[in-house]
Amino acid sequence: MKNIRHIYYVSENTGLLAKDSGKSLLCQFPGVEFQEELLPFIRTKDDAQRTINAIREKCGEEKPIIFSTIFDPEINKILQHEDVILLNICEPFLTQLEGMLGKNALRASGHSRNVDQQIMSNRVDAIHYTISHDDGTAIMDYEEADLIIVGVSRSGKTPISVFLATQMGIKTANYPLVEQDLTFCQLPEDIIKNKHKVVGLSISPDVLHTFREQRYKGSHYAQMSTCKRETLQSKRIFEKYDLPVVFSDARSIEETATQVAQELSKQWNPIF
């Protein structure tokens, strides 16, 4: 019989921080099998008591591991039961901050929810903007963008833009280089005047050909010669305007989006 360790992620909110942090630690133990469960929205002492009772009943004599991001000391006191191992992810850092700042932390529930609500509001705005400015739509509104991704058609601009909006709250417009741009090696004026927000997205002709063939098989648009010409011209445009460039080949959407965000940071932050 396999030795499986039960893992619980508990939080007063969604529990995503507890889960992400816990998983980052657990992945350092590849030889151990874990059974994980997310228990969000534990906001009262009654919630905590019901939670700990259910965990103890399910795990029996085994000591399960609980990753927590709960601040409330009364709730933590209930969760700190002798039959479980409680790892509060925030507490060590909170204690350090108290020492450095010379002040006691509130350790009160609800404050992080206010932050979460603001983050959610920002992300909703970013998503709305990004969807409304996909594929060169409403280019005259690029002043409001946090980021403008430029690249040839089917290079991955839309999924990367959506990821940046939903996960990072970045208002992202994306613009496809059309035939006129490629022929004259010229960007539209609305992009040029927002050049400090622009990141070029590059892709190899082979990968671009594969993507286009999947959707428009046998078309001139998908031909290798077309893909080679467009990727070469896009490279010339990026060089002409001295734009930062991210290569999307052999990377996941998450990896490419993160690198795009890093390039944006370099544009804004002189330290980088």
Curated annotation (Swiss-Prot):
Pfam families: Kinase-PPPase. ADP binds at residues 151-158. It catalyses: [pyruvate, water dikinase] + ADP = [pyruvate, water dikinase]-phosphate + AMP + H(+); [pyruvate, water dikinase]-phosphate + phosphate + H(+) = [pyruvate, water dikinase] + diphosphate. Keywords: Kinase, Nucleotide-binding, Serine/threonine-protein kinase, Transferase. Its EC number is 2.7.11.33, 2.7.4.28. The keyword Glycosyltransferase does not apply. It comes from the Bacteria. The keyword ATP-binding does not apply. InterPro entries: Kinase-pyrophosphorylase, PSRP. GO terms for molecular function: ADP binding; ATP binding; phosphotransferase activity, phosphate group as acceptor; protein serine/threonine kinase activity. HAMAP family: PSRP (MF_01062). Bifunctional serine/threonine kinase and phosphorylase involved in the regulation of the phosphoenolpyruvate synthase (PEPS) by catalyzing its phosphorylation/dephosphorylation. Belongs to the pyruvate, phosphate/water dikinase regulatory protein family. PSRP subfamily. This is Putative phosphoenolpyruvate synthase regulatory protein.
